[in-house]
Swiss-Prot record:
Disulfides per UniProt: C178-C213
Compositionally biased intervals (Gly residues): 52-94
Name of the protein this chain belongs to: Major prion protein
Glycosylation sites: N180, N196
Topological type in the membrane: Lipid-anchor; GPI-anchor
Lipidation (GPI-anchor amidated serine): S229
Designated gene of the protein: PRNP
Length: 252
């Protein structure tokens, strides 16, 4: 890790040092810096054009037929058909704004979808609701239960409730807590709708939810370790020195 940081520091120093020097070099003069050829600017060779006020028929420097510097047919500098500088069909005030675009409406389906996965569920003491999963194909050892599961699997949960993995000592504790809270919440919600579960249903739900909780644990553990690795990388001294040097080049 230290060697990688040193090589990164060397490459960025070599690249940004040239950029830092370029920023401090004086810039040469622009186009026609030796003097202006237009009136009133004192070029060495004299002006090639006489002092100009307005154009033809311009008493105050406006365009053709412009008494006060507006566009064609504009007495006071507004757009076409604008007597006092407003937009088309506007008298310069805040009224007549029928052409103003309306504000976009918030799509509530998108808001609900964003809050569905990984959101903290209110009233459950810090539990989060995982993303929807495909129900696993499980064999229960006999044809009757296998057929019963295939016919009723849609009645079982496809999402699990869980807490962050750093609150548990091992996978077993995470899975045990995940199974209990998920089955409890699903049973209460379904019973409220007038549907009851048999002992066979509860047995199958335990197997299904256990598999989904294991999958959720593996997913959360991987994300947790990736976040930890990123923190270790950015907290190493070579990377801190590199970031400080880049900030110095940008600000300086």
């Amino acid at each position: 890790m230290a060697n990688l940081g040193c090589w990164m520091l060397f490459l960025f120093v070599a690249t940004w040092s040239d950029l830092g020097l370029c920023k401090k070099r004086p810039k040469p003069g622009g186009w026609n810096t030796g003097g202006s050829r237009y009136p009133g600017q004192g070029s060495p060779g004299g002006n090639r054009y006489p002092p100009q006020g307005g154009g033809w028929g311009q008493p105050h420097g406006g365009g053709w037929g412009q008494p006060h510097g507006g566009g064609w047919g504009q007495p006071h500098g507004g757009g076409w058909g604008q007597p006092h500088g407003g937009g088309w069909g506007q008298g310069g005030g805040t009224h007549s704004q029928w052409n103003k675009p309306s504000k976009p409406k918030t799509n509530m389906k998108h808001v609900a979808g964003a809050a569905a996965a990984g959101a903290v569920v209110g009233g459950l003491g810090g539990y989060m609701l995982g993303s929807a999963m495909s129900r696993p194909l499980i064999h229960f050892g006999n044809d009757y239960e296998d057929r019963y599961y295939r016919e009723n699997m849609y009645r079982y949960p496809n999402q699990v409730y869980y807490r962050p993995v750093d609150q548990y000592n091992n996978q077993n504790n995470f899975v045990h807590d995940c199974v209990n809270i998920t089955i409890k919440q699903h049973t209460v919600t379904t019973t409220t709708k007038g549907e009851n579960f048999t002992e066979t249903d509860v047995k199958m739900m335990e197997r299904v939810v256990e598999q989904m909780c294991i999958t959720q644990y593996e997913k959360e553990s991987q994300a947790y370790y990736q976040r930890g690795s990123s923190m270790v990388l950015f907290s190493s001294p070579p990377v801190i020195l590199l970031i400080s040097f880049l900030i110095f080049l940008i600000v300086g």
